[in-house]
Curated annotation (Swiss-Prot):
Coiled coil: none
Name of the protein described by the UniProt record: Serine--tRNA ligase
Binding annotation for L-serine: 226-228, 280, 379
Catalysis: reaction(s): tRNA(Ser) + L-serine + ATP = L-seryl-tRNA(Ser) + AMP + diphosphate + H(+); tRNA(Sec) + L-serine + ATP = L-seryl-tRNA(Sec) + AMP + diphosphate + H(+)
BP terms from Gene Ontology: selenocysteine biosynthetic process; seryl-tRNA aminoacylation
Subunit structure: Homodimer. The tRNA molecule binds across the dimer.
PROSITE patterns per the UniProt record, alphabetical: AA_TRNA_LIGASE_II
Origin: domain of life: Bacteria
Pathway: Aminoacyl-tRNA biosynthesis; selenocysteinyl-tRNA(Sec) biosynthesis; L-seryl-tRNA(Sec) from L-serine and tRNA(Sec): step 1/1
One Pfam family linked to the record: Seryl_tRNA_N
Matching SUPFAM superfamilies: Class II aaRS and biotin synthetases (SSF55681), tRNA-binding arm (SSF46589)
Subcellular location: Cytoplasm
Enzyme Commission numbers on file: 6.1.1.11
Length: 417
């Protein structure tokens, strides 16, 4: 959640953020009213409790003849205290509810507008020029007996698939390359749970307006769409030592997404699916270091795409395209020859203290005072990378030239059937 002090003391900052997101600003006034109602309820409860304490002392020192009347008054006062406590709890619940509904405050650096207002920061690599009509990744994968969508549909339904033979080996090679990069860069590896409690999913900002994108089990647990969720909850209700720098993790997991809002989009192949693999970077840092850490995460993602010899561009995402938790976000988009366009294959987000406030993750400074950490995340490798590898490195006969960095992991220079 956002810093309540910012909402109470400088509500115009929150109103501007809501405006940039294209969302209602009325929730700001609703939240401020709820805050005032809470303060009134707290004051009323504390006043009655003070009266109750005075009366208790009076009863203790009273004469026997006065005690029945004092007890009658005490019983009436106890009922008023009980009602006041209930009103305070009700007011607090309303305040917390509205506070949780407000998305993170958008960075002043984030562009205004929707998707077409995203700012391209840079473009890296040469777009491949083919002397033949490039095939799409599914055609290539089927020719190589590496991707089997039809049997995925038969077994699990639409947007499922099998990676087979070279397809499975290629994904594992990509993941291992990313893992090696992460370990050499000092990240700690985690293999994370893919089932989490509702409070962890809520804490990371994936419920509310995003609830339709995640799978909820009858038990109440949620399947995670990214290991970001589990890693964000990993240090919940803890005080971290970040005095020597950021705490950085790389979490591997299978990921599950309903893709409820993408009906009819990317129905061919493995670009947008219900289950995929991902290695996710996640950082806990001092809030003043979050901008620098975001740049570090993006630099790691760029190293990975450069190793895979994939042309890409980096875009600063417009405010209306940001998720609930993100204050700022960069997308890294790979060139997809069959579509003659750029497509997002990985992203990096600065969530500032938004998730940490919800999950109660703090640090202690040199003076002994505690504060909330900032959390950031970014994908280092995912199944979607296979789309860009197959299409950018295809040859006229349907074989795939293996990027040099993957050759030691695959044991050859070319993938062919």
């Amino acid at each position: 959640m956002i810093d309540p002090e910012i909402l109470v003391n400088t509500p115009d900052i929150v109103r501007l953020s809501q405006k940039k997101r294209g969302e209602s600003q009325s929730i700001v006034e609703d939240a401020l009213i709820a805050r005032r109602n809470l303060r009134i309820a707290i004051n009323n409860f504390e006043t009655l409790r003070a009266e109750q304490n005075v009366l208790s002392k009076k009863i203790a020192g009273s004469e026997d003849s006065d005690r029945p009347e004092l007890m009658r008054v005490a019983n009436l006062l106890a009922e008023r205290v009980k009602n006041a406590r209930e009103e305070q709890e009700k007011a607090n619940s309303e305040w917390k509810k509205l506070l949780f509904e407000i998305p993170n405050i958008v960075s002043s650096e984030a562009p205004y507008g929707v998707e077409d207002k995203c700012a391209v920061m840079k473009t890296v690599g040469d777009i491949p020029e083919f002397d033949f009509e490039p095939a799409d990744h599914l055609q290539l994968g089927e020719q190589l007996d590496a991707i089997d969508v039809s049997r995925g549909v038969k077994v699990s339904g639409t947007r499922f698939y099998f990676l087979k033979g070279w397809g499975a080996r290629l994904e594992l090679a990509v993941m291992n390359l990313a893992l090696d990069l992460a370990l050499k860069s000092g990240l700690t590896l985690l293999i994370t749970p893919t089932l989490v409690k509702p409070e962890i999913m809520l804490g990371t900002g994936f419920l509310g307006r995003h609830e339709g994108e995640v799978y909820r089990l009858p038990s109440g647990y949620y399947l995670t769409g990214t290991s970001e969720v589990a890693i964000a909850g990993y240090h919940s209700d803890e005080i971290l030592d970040i005095s020597s720098g950021p705490i950085r993790y790389a979490g591997w997991s299978s990921c599950y997404r309903r893709e409820a809002g993408s009906h009819g989009r990317d129905t061919r192949g493995i670009m947008r699916v219900h289950q995929f693999s991902k290695l996710e970077m996640f950082s806990y840092v001092h809030p003043q270091q979050s901008t620098r850490e975001l740049e570090h995460i993006v630099s790691m993602q760029e190293k990975m795409l450069n190793l895979l010899e994939i042309p890409y561009r980096v875009s600063d995402i417009a405010a209306e395209e940001l998720g609930t938790s993100a204050s700022r976000k960069y997308d890294l988009e790979a060139w997809i020859p069959s579509q003659n366009t750029w497509r997002e294959v990985t992203s990096a987000s600065d969530c500032t203290t938004f998730q940490a406030r919800r999950l109660n993750v703090r640090y202690r400074d040199e003076s002994g005072r505690t504060g909330y950490v900032a959390t950031l995340n970014g994908t280092l490798a995912t199944t979607r990378f296979l789309v860009a590898i197959l299409e950018n490195h295809q040859t006229s006969n349907g074989s795939i030239r293996v990027p040099e960095a993957l050759r030691p992991l695959l044991g050859q220079d070319v993938i062919e059937r």
